[in-house]
Amino acid sequence: MVPGELLVDDGEHPLIPCRRTVTLVVRNSADRPIQVGSHYHFAETNGALDFDRAAARGMRLNITSGTAVRFEPGQQRTVELVDFAGSRTVYGFRGDIQGPLDAGTAETAPGLPQQP
């Protein structure tokens, strides 16, 4: 063994086991590309991204840390989201939440605009 060497079993290894995930279809209705980073609260992304924001509350992209997904104008793609962990408190982003994610359900919690 070499110092720092990692010995990994064969096969696939989930990066984030035991956390809820959801798959959503997202469409960019803007005339410019929109890029979303790995740890951005997905429900608070650019308003030109069309998807179920209530379903995305408290979730981020299930991608490797430090990476991003780019949505070209008019592009529709399917993404997998994963629950935020830790204290599940969100500040910043677009300023829609500013506190605990679990203060209520997606339908009653303050912050996110409701879909028509």
UniProtKB/Swiss-Prot annotation:
Residues 97-116 are annotated as: Disordered. The keyword Disulfide bond does not apply. Pathway: Nitrogen metabolism; urea degradation; CO(2) and NH(3) from urea (urease route): step 1/1. It comes from the Bacteria. The keyword Metal-binding does not apply. It is an enzyme of class 3 (hydrolase). Its EC number is 3.5.1.5. It catalyses: urea + 2 H2O + H(+) = hydrogencarbonate + 2 NH4(+). Gene3D superfamilies: Urease, beta subunit (2.10.150.10). This is Urease subunit beta.
